[in-house]
Every structure is written in structure tokens, then in C-alpha cells.
């Protein structure tokens, strides 16, 4: 009898890359819907802009590299990159910003390294950080959520603001950014950091309209819960593994709790960290990128915990209010080292 020994891999996953990417896109629907509800139609316009620009940029590079355009675009990775960047920037940011960010993400952060599977850094976060460093004012100019907002532009007005800087009635960005009593509204994390530096007490800060939510900032808590719902669905579909989200959230919660207990007058409470900013989006949709995250189970736990620690440190002591994007990229740098020291021992061989 002749036995044929096939080469590895010996187990096969029937789900192709395009299907996994499609599942992630579908899981993003609750988060997108929440952002549309609280921040207006600008989010949808940015998603459409980002989708078109990422596809065009990827097609151009593939054409120059003489690779199959149609086959590569079908993997949906470019669409996901555009989506993640679009939901991370303010809804009424100028059109050229999302185009610049997505083009940089696709061409420099992805295709320059060889395309999908070769890039060491998350492309969407590279694009986001480039925009944040280059245009900090525009990237931190979020509308107040509709619960406390005076002006939330409709679909047509959102298009006009994004492309021309003002609505049909003449309202410019400064007018639209004004919230209750003419006070400019930022994100809960940005408001907290700015107010603490100005010498305000936590008790005073918690009286601001932006913190009128039940658990955290108005609107932002529901946006984060919506992204959490999508992330749990991804876990149920087994499109992602639990190690990174769990270790990230547990570490962030633990650091925030300890910091708040030791310094309640200067550091934010744990619920603000967990339900504000890009916490849930980062935990389930960004950090779990299979290309740029650790590949071993122990490594995933370390990777997620490191990102959680970095997010808390940047939010609490850094110069930027959120920190998820920087934490992701810094954690990406450590992946080769983490994988090297957490690689499983080959059966029958001694360690070392």
C-alpha cells in the first residue's frame, strides 16, 4: 500500500479573504448607523468618498505593478481600509482630507510594502495619523451629538460643507461646531483633557453638556456600544478571535480604574475610557487585523494588553485626546518580537 504525504497546511479554512472582509464590513453597520444618528449625514458622505478613493488608488497602483486589478479589488480589503478611516475622522472634514488619508493608506502603507499580507502597519491608522499630525485642528473638530447640538446639517448641507466649507444658508464650520449656549463642543476625551489642563475639577467637568450621557459622553457611549455589538457578532461568526479584544479592554479598564482611584481629580473614570473615542472600534475592528497583529494566542493576549496600556497612557499623559491609532501602530512594531518569543514549541523538541 502506498501512502501519499501531502505538504502542509493539513487543515483548511474555506473562508476566503474577501468573505472575511465582507463580514467585517457587515459588522460595521451598527457602528455606522449610530454615527449617522448622532453626528449626521457627513459620516456617510465620508464613507462614500473614502470607498471611491481607496478603490481608485489601489487600481492605479496595481495597474502600474502590472497585477490583476479586478481580482485584487474583489478581496474587499481596500473598502475596509477606506471605511475604517472614514468613520475615524470628523463627519464634516474637508473632502480632500479623506482622499489624502486613504490614498496615503493604500499607496504608502499597503502597496509600497507589496500589498495585502505584506504591510507591517495598519494602513487605515497610518492614514489617520498622517492626517492628525498634519491637520490637527480639522481632525479634532467633531460636531456635538444631536442630543446637545444646535446645528446638525442634513444630507445636502453635509455635502456642501464637505466640498465648499459652508451650507446653502451660509453657515460655515465655526457655526456648525457651536453647541449649547454657543460653547464649542469636542469629544468627551478631548474636553476632559483640555479642561483638566485648564485647572477645572473633575466634578465641574462632569457637569458639561457633553457628559450628559448615562455612562460616558453624550452620543459617544451609544456609538461605542454599537461598535461593541458589531464586534460581538464578528466573534460569533468566528471572523476574529477573542484574545486581542478581551486583553485590550481588560487592560484599559484595569489601568483606568487604578489611575482613577489614585488620582480622581486629574484622570478620567474607567467608563469614559471604555465608552468614548475609538475604544470599541479599535478593540474589534482595528487591532484584530490579521496581517498586522500577533499570530499566536499568547502573542495576541500580549499584543492586546500592550495596546490597552498605550491607549491609557496616551489619553492620560500624552498630547492627544484619544490615542488608539498611535497605540495600534506602536503595538504593530512589537509584533515580530512578540511572535518570536511566543511561538509554540514543536512537538518532540526541547525549548530553546
UniProtKB/Swiss-Prot annotation:
UniProt xrefs under InterPro entries: NqrB/RnfD, RnfD_bac
Membrane topology, record value: Multi-pass membrane protein
This protein's encoding gene: rsxD
Family: Belongs to the NqrB/RnfD family.
Transmembrane annotation, as ranges: 20-40, 42-62, 89-109, 123-143, 214-234, 242-262, 267-287, 301-321, 322-342
EC number of the protein: 7.-.-.-
Compartments (UniProt record): Cell inner membrane
Function: Part of a membrane-bound complex that couples electron transfer with translocation of ions across the membrane. Required to maintain the reduced state of SoxR.
Top-rank taxon, per record: Bacteria
Record's protein name: Ion-translocating oxidoreductase complex subunit D
Keywords from the named record: Cell inner membrane, Cell membrane, Electron transport, Flavoprotein, FMN, Membrane, Phosphoprotein, Translocase, Transmembrane, Transmembrane helix, Transport
Amino acid at each position: 500500500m502506498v501512502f501519499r504525504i501531502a505538504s502542509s497546511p493539513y487543515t483548511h479554512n474555506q473562508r476566503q479573504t474577501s468573505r472575511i472582509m465582507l463580514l467585517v464590513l457587515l459588522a460595521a453597520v451598527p457602528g455606522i448607523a449610530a454615527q449617522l444618528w448622532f453626528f449626521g449625514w457627513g459620516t456617510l458622505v465620508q464613507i462614500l468618498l473614502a470607498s471611491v478613493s481607496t478603490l481608485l488608488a489601489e487600481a492605479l497602483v496595481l495597474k502600474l505593478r502590472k497585477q490583476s486589478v479586478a481580482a485584487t479589488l474583489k478581496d474587499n480589503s481596500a473598502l475596509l481600509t477606506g471605511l475604517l478611516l472614514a468613520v475615524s475622522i470628523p463627519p464634516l472634514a474637508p473632502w480632500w482630507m479623506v482622499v489624502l488619508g486613504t490614498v496615503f493608506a493604500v499607496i504608502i502603507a499597503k502597496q509600497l510594502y507589496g500589498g495585502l499580507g505584506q504591510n507591517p502597519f495598519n494602513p487605515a491608522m497610518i492614514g489617520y495619523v498622517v492626517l492628525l499630525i498634519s491637520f490637527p485642528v480639522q481632525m479634532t473638530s467633531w460636531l456635538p451629538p444631536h442630543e446637545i447640538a444646535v446645528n446638525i446639517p442634513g444630507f445636502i448641507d453635509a455635502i456642501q460643507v464637505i466640498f465648499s466649507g459652508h451650507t446653502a444658508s451660509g453657515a460655515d464650520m465655526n457655526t456648525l461646531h457651536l453647541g449649547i449656549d454657543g460653547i464649542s463642543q469636542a469629544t468627551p476625551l478631548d474636553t476632559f483633557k483640555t479642561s483638566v489642563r485648564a485647572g477645572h475639577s473633575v466634578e465641574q467637568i462632569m457637569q458639561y453638556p457633553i457628559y450628559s450621557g448615562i455612562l460616558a459622553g453624550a452620543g459617544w457611549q451609544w456609538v461605542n456600544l454599537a461598535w461593541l455589538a458589531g464586534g460581538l457578532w464578528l466573534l460569533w461568526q468566528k471572523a476574529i478571535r477573542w484574545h486581542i479584544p478581551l486583553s485590550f479592554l481588560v487592560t484599559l479598564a484595569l489601568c483606568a480604574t487604578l489611575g482613577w482611584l489614585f488620582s480622581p481629580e486629574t484622570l478620567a473614570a474607567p467608563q469614559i475610557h471604555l465608552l468614548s473615542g475609538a475604544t470599541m472600534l479599535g478593540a474589534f475592528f482595528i487591532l484584530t487585523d490579521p496581517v498586522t497583529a500577533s499570530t499566536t494566542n499568547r502573542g495576541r493576549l500580549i499584543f492586546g494588553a500592550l495596546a490597552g496600556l498605550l491607549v491609557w497612557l496616551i489619553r492620560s499623559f500624552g498630547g492627544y485626546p484619544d490615542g488608539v491609532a498611535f497605540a495600534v501602530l506602536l503595538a504593530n512594531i512589537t509584533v515580530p518580537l512578540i511572535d518570536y518569543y511566543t511561538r509554540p514549541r514543536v512537538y518532540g523538541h526541547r525549548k530553546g
